[in-house]
C-alpha cells in the first residue's frame, strides 16, 4: 500500500482513518507529493514545505491528531542551526514540520530511505541518509550536513540514533551526534517531542495531542570543546 510503513498492522488503523476522511483529496495530494519528490530542484524548499504542511494538516485533522507547538519563538532568527529532537516514531518529522514555520532537512538512517510516503517526503526536503555500518560514508554525510548548515539551512538529527520503544522515555545519545553542529559552528536547538509515537506506532485511533517543544538554543561558544 502507498501508506505502508513496514511496521505491521499496528500503524494502519489511524493511517486508514486519515485516508478515508480525506478520500477526495488523497489522489491529488499523492500525485502532488510524488511530482514534488520527482522534481526536487524545480521548487524552493519553502514551496516544498508549503505543500507538505498542507498534507500534514489534512492528515492530522482526519486522523484525530492535534499538534501543539511550544517555544517556536526560541528558534534563532537566522537560519543555519541544527535541531536535536528525541526520536519517538515515524511521525516525528511530520510533527516538527507542522509545529514551526521554518524549513529544514533531515539526517536519517538509510533503512528508512525507501519507505513509501516517507520516501517522497524525504526527497522534497533533501534528506541525507547515513549508513551506520559504514564509518567512511557516515563521516561523509556528517560533512555534507555541516556544509548545508554553513549555507544557512537548518538540519535535524536524532541524537538517540533510533526510535525509543519506551514511549516518552529517552534513550542514550550516540557518540558523534553533535559533530555536525561542531563542524558548522552553529547554534544547537534542543527539541522535546511528547506522544509522537502514538499516531503511527501504536494500535489506536483515539484523539491524541502531540507536543513539540523548542527549547532555548545553545550557541557554539557554550558547547565548543565539550
Spell out what each predicted region is.
Residues 87-89, 160-164:
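Short glycine-rich anion-binding loops that position phosphate/pyrophosphate groups of nucleotides
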Residues 33-37, 47-49, 62-63, 77-135:
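Catalytic core of membrane glycerolipid acyltransferases/transacylases, capturing the structured
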Residues 117-120, 153-156, 165-226:
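A cross-family acyltransferase "interaction/gating" segment
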Residues 80-82, 154-158:
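Residue-level preference for the first positions of well-ordered beta-strands
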Residues 137-146:
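Anionic-ligand binding region
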Residues 8-68, 120-121:
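A transmembrane-helix-recognition feature enriched in membrane-embedded lipid enzymes
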Residues 2-5:
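Aromatic (phenylalanine/tyrosine) cluster motif
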Residues 61-70, 138-139, 194-196:
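Short gly/ser/thr-rich secondary-structure transition/capping motifs
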